[in-house]
Amino acid sequence: MKKLVFILVLLIYCSLATAQEQGDFRVQIAGDYKLQINDLGGNAGFEYFFADRFSFAPSFTYWFPDIGRSYSLNADLRYYLTEGISQVYLVGGYNNFWLNLQPGEPGQVLSRAGANFGVGAFLDLMDQFGVVTEFKLQSQNTRQPVLRVGVVFKL
């Protein structure tokens, strides 16, 4: 867990150091909801625009299950179909899900890797602030649909 947080902070730092133009880098705070099993999670991530209409968007979600502990790491590629105030995009990437039904017990963590794909929209409300919604399917286990709603800060 500490390694994941360290890697995420390092990636954010590296992206801040290289993004020079306004709008090239965004930070996101969101809530995730698994539609089939009614599971809520808190999400944090960033987005870096490396080419016209393309961005790399890693994020980390900590889920709040009824029993145990679970979290997931996403590394997504986004392609923006529209520009302007309402920006619609396609998303696809890698997801790894970790589940521990007995926290504190060594060797009890279940790890599932898979792909995800979906669609999202970014609504540009102000110069440095916006709202994001995203719907995607994750391929692990039962092809879990996830809905994300959050706020985005442009740096």
Regions found by a protein language model. Give the residues of each.
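Solvent-exposed loop/turn segments connecting transmembrane beta-strands
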Residues: 30-42, 63-71, 110-112, 136-147
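Membrane-embedded beta-strand positions of outer-membrane beta-barrel proteins
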Residues: 27-31, 44, 58, 75, ...
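Flexible, solvent-exposed loop segments that connect beta-strands
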Residues: 24-29, 58-73, 98-115, 155
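Short glycine/proline- and aromatic-enriched beta-strand/turn motifs that initiate or cap beta-hairpins
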Residues: 19-65, 154
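Residue-level signature of outer-membrane beta-barrel architecture
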Residues: 33, 48, 79-81, 96, ...
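Cleavable N-terminal export/targeting peptides
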Residues: 1-23
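Repeated loop/turn-to-beta-strand initiation elements of outer-membrane beta-barrel proteins
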Residues: 25, 53-58, 85-88, 123-131
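Outer-membrane beta-barrel "beta-signal"
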Residues: 77-79, 117, 122, 143-155
